Amino acid sequence: MEKVTFYGEIEGISLEQMVRYGKFDMRVKHFHNQYEIFYIIEGERLFFFNNREYVARSGDLILVDTNLIHMTKSVTAEDTGHNRVILYVSYDRMKAFDGQYPSLQLVRFFHEHYGVYHLDKEQQALFLNFYRNLRIAMTEKAHNYKVGIDLETLTWLFKITSYVSKQEGASPHSSDHPKYRTA
């Protein structure tokens, strides 16, 4: 069972929070033409990309490049569920951000730095505050809220690019399943 606790969107940016109860495995690998920023509030997930699996836990941030084949599944058969937030940014919107602020090189950043990142407590609070601010803006739709969403998103992307550039992503998890072993 699953429950979408929030969904909001503007052109090129969408935000979703979902709680899943119990074990959940995606049945097929997939890709999309959006950048995916996946944050785990509670629980844990196995992420698969580039024929490797990574364990992501509460407080972890997962960056998924556009058109990157990926999927997630439960870590164990006894999985009790997870609570996650996903921010999707379209390729066109990311290119527009790059056009406004070329030194950020966001398209290049996602291409080079997709993966699982373990955030410290301050960075976790930063993401949750970012999520809260976007959620409020998308719900209340106050004057110039779309500009506010762009500014919040750019500020957060600026901060995360600095952090990720200094940290290595998580190492692949050793799988017992022969289908997912790395070569």
Task: Place the predicted regions along the sequence by residue.
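Short, Lys/Arg-enriched, Trp-marked, Pro/Gly-tolerant hinge/linker segments that flank
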Residues: 113-122, 138-149, 158-183
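A hydrophobic/aromatic-rich effector-binding and dimerization subdomain
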Residues: 2-15, 69, 73-136, 162-166
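Broad gene-expression machinery/nucleic-acid interaction feature
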Residues: 36, 83-86, 182
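Generic protein-terminus/edge-of-domain signal
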Residues: 1-61, 68, 104, 115
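Hydrophobic packing residues in well-ordered alpha-helices of helical domains and bundles
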Residues: 84, 127, 146-149, 153, ...
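Short, flexible, glycine/charge-rich loop motifs used to bind or transfer phosphoryl groups or to couple energy/partner
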Residues: 27-28, 52, 75-77, 173
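Short hydrophobic-aromatic micro-motifs
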Residues: 62-64, 87-88
